[in-house]
């Protein structure tokens, strides 16, 4: 396995009295796609949100155990805003801001006080190219982002994320609201993005996990049942529960 970006050790998470994650131990490799799979409510999205401390925003959450990124304690004395720049997130439904295509991508930089137009122009173009969207929008950058198709909006959100130069991109079912053609474009994009970023994706699609991920982790009722190379998980899993899930015996 490649070098480890995240290392998760004995992680427990509670929503009040309800335990959502149970003693999770999982290494996440650098510059690969790691897919988190399992039935609804199994804890995969909860774990994803631990990686950039989005769960901090939920009242009553308690987390124990250890989670490090490049050896640094994610739940230690760190700047959470900086963490969420380094660990960007793309959500299930495209969520462009109510502004132009250009300003969507430039938004984070402007929020950091960057005003130099040449620099902004360069980052916007580079980010849109990185999200495989530049050729489709380069002649209408001042147009409202809501005029884009759903698939284009999701790639715009990816461009907005990579404009901040993160180390990691988290994706929470990023294609579930998209048609097959748009889904295919996002999947192709992930293959290219992993050359520069560590990607962790939650998906309900077994076919998608098999197509796009290098590693797969299977969750069930808050437990990590097993994790391995994706080919192993789908062809020769160690646990009968994993075999049953990937074969469609339950969902």
UniProtKB/Swiss-Prot annotation:
UniProt keyword list: ATP-binding, Cell inner membrane, Cell membrane, Membrane, Nucleotide-binding, Phosphate transport, Translocase, Transport
Compartment(s) where it occurs, according to its Swiss-Prot or TrEMBL record: Cell inner membrane
Domain ABC transporter positions: 6-246
One GO cellular component term noted in the UniProt record for this chain: plasma membrane
Keyword Nucleotide-binding recorded: yes
The keyword Membrane is assigned to this record: yes
InterPro entries (UniProt xref): AAA+_ATPase, ABC_transporter-like_ATP-bd, ABC_transporter-like_CS, P-loop_NTPase, PstB-like
SUPFAM superfamilies: P-loop containing nucleoside triphosphate hydrolases (SSF52540)
Subunit structure, as described in the record: The complex is composed of two ATP-binding proteins (PstB), two transmembrane proteins (PstC and PstA) and a solute-binding protein (PstS).
Function summary: Part of the ABC transporter complex PstSACB involved in phosphate import. Responsible for energy coupling to the transport system.
NCBIfam families: 3a0107s01c2
Family: Belongs to the ABC transporter superfamily. Phosphate importer (TC 3.A.1.7) family.
Name under which the protein is recorded: Phosphate import ATP-binding protein PstB 2
Gene from which this protein is expressed: pstB2
